[in-house]
């Protein structure tokens, strides 16, 4: 009898535990690549929100490396499994739009949005105002090199909406033209004394060793390059290799013959800025992207109205930090 009661209690406990687990809402946070330290911080914010909100699971999943088709397949699999919400940093905006079209599952984007024409397919965008990253990168370059010159922009994937917006911010600011809303905008061809180096822009596809090799090659090919401006921290994410290249060209960097201004402010990048390997960093807040993404998905499934910073774009912005050596102490690392 006693054994029977114990067995029944164990069954009830397991059943209750199963019900409790089943009631958790599963929200997927899908980065462009799991091997990118930028996205690690978004994962951390996601996990903190999971504990804070309660009753939800932050499912952090994505391609091991930057692979557009694999990311699309992962999102399609999540939809098929019936998760309760998906937040995705789109590697290929057009392909991702096709993947999420028609689903009833709440979809939001973070870090990298869908194209403007497909914005109706997602409930919100959480992240940086990407065009402004380009604006601030350009402003630093123009302050350091007011007479113009030859610039090389290094980007992520050619189909990545966020990097195309950043590239446009750089070009438009330097050229003194307004945001046309078409990304990427036209290359620089002498506006305000600036041209783009032959072979640029460079596309890394978030392959960090490749990005360092591209940097080394472009420095060798263009000894009079005025500015090297990556729209993401790509070369800095392989610290030893980046530092090897900057040490090789230490004279032209320290003398500011070539200005090196890069997006993002992860800890290793701030070390580079402090050491003089770069002249400026424009930082995002990936932790807040992951954190806010969970809160936004929870509000959506609870039927709550979202509060947008830009209602027309259904955008929730997480802020930027513009960092140079004089203000390095007040800049957020990450």
Spell out what each predicted region is.
Residues 1-4:
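Positively charged n-region of N-terminal signal peptides that target proteins for export
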